[in-house]
Amino acid sequence: MKSLVGGVVLWGLFLGWNSASAAADNAVECNSAGARLVEQGKLEAAIAQFQKAISLDAKYFPARLNLAYAYEKMNQTEEAIEAYRAAIDAQPRNFFAHNNLGVLYDKKGLYDSAITEFKTALQIESGNSMARKNLEIAEKNKGAIEKRAARIESAEKEARAKPNDPRVSYNVARTYAFYGQKESAFEWLNKARKQGYKDLEYLKIDPAFESLRNDPDFERLANP
């Protein structure tokens, strides 16, 4: 799978924000402090500052976006997704929130949701090359997953039609191995061997099993 690009979202003192109260002023200060902490790599402390900013002024949008970004940098994907959704609820036409949420959805394999977010981002900024590239990659990733699922289903369908054929079981094993699904590959390879698959010389050089070649279980199956 290809990787996508999240927009750089780190807003310190948001100059376009007109505070109307001491609480709002304090929210701006907390957000700025959080932004500095992110730059220093102190993400947990930064998150606390962004959360404090939001508690002081729920309408202060930069803190919401920065909170999501900090969670993302900490690889706390679920928390980041929730924070980006909250940011979108607060400001539905924010480009960065939609783009970065799309990146996280793609990371989780939720390609339809990712594609929807990138399309929304492009409705907001139609000429943005980052979002357009992300959309292209998400669509390709979705296509690759669908192709993988179709190949696996085709192999297993043949196995269901020929449940005692070791060559068919072997083909299912190599299909799983090709896509890096180790446990399923070994399950079907063991089945093929029990059914009488004997071409061990080919098994040892079959490129589909390259990712399993150094695994002790593979060594055991290839050299009984």
Predicted stretch roles:
Residues 40-52, 72-86, 96, 108-120, ...:
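Structural signature of tandem alpha-helical TPR/SEL1-like repeats
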Residues 56, 90, 124, 161-162, ...:
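Structural marker of alpha-solenoid helical repeat scaffolds
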Residues 31, 38-39, 65, 69-72, ...:
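Position-specific recognition of the canonical hydrophobic site in helix A of tetratricopeptide repeat
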Residues 25-59, 69-73, 150, 154, ...:
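Alpha-helical segment of the N-proximal tetratricopeptide repeat
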Residues 140, 144-224:
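Alpha-helical protein-protein interaction modules
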Residues 26-28, 61-62, 95-96, 129-130, ...:
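Helix-start (N-cap) detector for alpha-helical repeat units in TPR-like alpha-solenoids
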Residues 6-16:
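Bacterial N-terminal signal peptides
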